[in-house]
Amino acid sequence: MDAWLSRAFADLAPLIQAGPVAPTIDMDAFRTQLRGFDFERPLAFEGVLQWTLQQMQHGIVQMSNPRYFGLFNPGAAFPAQCADRVAAFFNPQLASSASSPVPVEIESHVIRAMAHRAGLGPDATGHFATGGSEANYTALILALTAAHPGFASDGARAFSGPPKFYTSRECHIAWLKIAHQAGIGRSALRLIDTAGHGRLDPEALARAIAADRAGGAVPVMVVATAGTPGGGMIDPLHGCADIARAGKLWFHVDAAWGGAALAAERLRPLLDGIERADSITIDAHKWLATTMGCAMFITSHGALLSEAFHASTSFMPSSLAASDPYLNSVQWSRRFLGLRLFFVLATAGWEGIGAHVERSVAVVARVRDALVARGWTVANDSPLAVLDVVPPAALGEVRTLVRRVVAAGRAWVAPTNFEGRDVVRICATHGETSESDIAALVASLDLPMTGRP
C-alpha cells in the first residue's frame, strides 16, 4: 500500500501543477458521498484512500501549484514531506527528553541554529510549535510573567492595573485571540497607527505607552512585525526595541513570515535589530518550504520559559526543565514537528534555502514590472515577496476582479486592504514558480481588460 500511495502521489503531482488552483468540487455532491460513510461496516482501505485523493485533488486550494500567489503558504519541499512520513512511522512522543532523546535533541539543534542566525546569544533556546499563534501566545505569557512574578499564580489580578501590549495595525490580527486566550482580554491589545507606509510609527507607540501608564494601565510588551500579512512590511525593529528597553517592556518580533530572510545573506540586513528581541516567532511553514504546522518560538530567556510553563507530576519519565518540552512550552503531548525543517536545512543548507527565499523576491519583482507596464499602481514598497497593487480603473473593483481571477482557476491571488486602500495582494513562496507561471498570473489579472487568453 505504501508503494501504491507513492505512485499515486507521483501521478497526481503533474495534474495538480497543471490544473486549476482553486477548488472545483461540487460540495453538495461531495456531502452526499460523505454521508455514505456511516461507519457501520468496514470498507477496504485502498478504496477509501483512492476516494480521498480524488476529493483532495479537486476540493482544496492547491498550495503546491506554482501559480498559487496567495497567503503565506508554500509548496512543501520533498524532504519536509518525507519528514512527516518518518515522524508518522515512529510516532515519537516529544513531551519528554527521556522518551524521545533523539527527536528532542534534533529540534533543539535546529532552534539553536536559527537563534544563531538571528544573532541571539549562545544561551538562546526555544521550541517548535504548531503555528505562529501558539508561538506568539508563548511570547505574551513570558512577557506577563516577566512583568510580574505573581502572574503565574494570580493571573491578571496580580497587576495594579490592566495589562497592555502594543503592535501595529498591520499586524496579524490573531493577537486579539491570543489576548483573549491569555485571560487579559482583547482590550489589552493596543493597535498602533503606521507612519503611512505600512510600518508601525514609533512616535505613536511611545505616545500610546505613556498615555496608558498615565491612565493606570500596565504596559508589558512591544511587538514588531517582520513581514506584515497585508503588505509584507517590516516594522522599525531598532525603534521598537529602543522604546521597549526604555520602558522595561518585553520586546517580541513576530517574524512568522519575514524571518525566512535570515537564511539569505543579501536579505538578512533587512532584519537588523532582531538580535535585540527577547523572543522571536518564525514559521517554517510560511517561507521555509516545510509542511503546515511547523513554527518556532525562540528566546534568550530560557529560565523564564521554564518558569512560565513548569509543572510537576509523578507519571512522566523525566522532569528536566531545560530539556523536557512539556516543562517549557504550551503543549504536553507533542508531534515531531522539527524534523521537517531539519531535513530541509540539512539537504539545502543555508545557501540553498537562502536562494529559495531570494528567488521568491525576484519572482514578485517580475510580476510587479509586468503589471506596472500594463498600467497597474504599486501600493506597498516591501523589500520581501509581497506585492500590493491597484488595477487600472477599466478592470473594475478589486474584490470583483480577484473573484474572477480565482474562479478562472489559472492563478490564485487575494484581496486585502493596505493603508485604507483595497489592493490585489500577490505573494510568492513556491520554489518552482516559472516564467510561464508568472505570465499566466499576469494574463489572468489583465484578461478582463484585454480579452487575451
What kind of region is each of these model predictions?
Residues 418-453:
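PLP-dependent enzyme catalytic core of the Aspartate aminotransferase-like
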Residues 381-386, 408-425:
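Conserved PLP cofactor-binding pocket of PLP-dependent enzymes
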Residues 135, 141-306:
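Conserved PLP-enzyme active-site core in the AAT-like
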Residues 102-103, 126-133, 167-168, 225, ...:
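Active-site nucleophile and cofactor-binding loops and adjacent substrate-binding regions
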Residues 1-123, 424-427, 433, 444-445:
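N-terminal entrance/gating region of PLP-dependent enzymes' catalytic architecture
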Residues 228, 272-374, 379:
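Active-site C-terminal subdomain of aminotransferase-like
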Residues 114-142, 190-193:
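Short loop-beta-helix segment that forms the pyridoxal 5′-phosphate
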Residues 377-405:
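Conserved PLP-binding catalytic core of the aspartate aminotransferase-like
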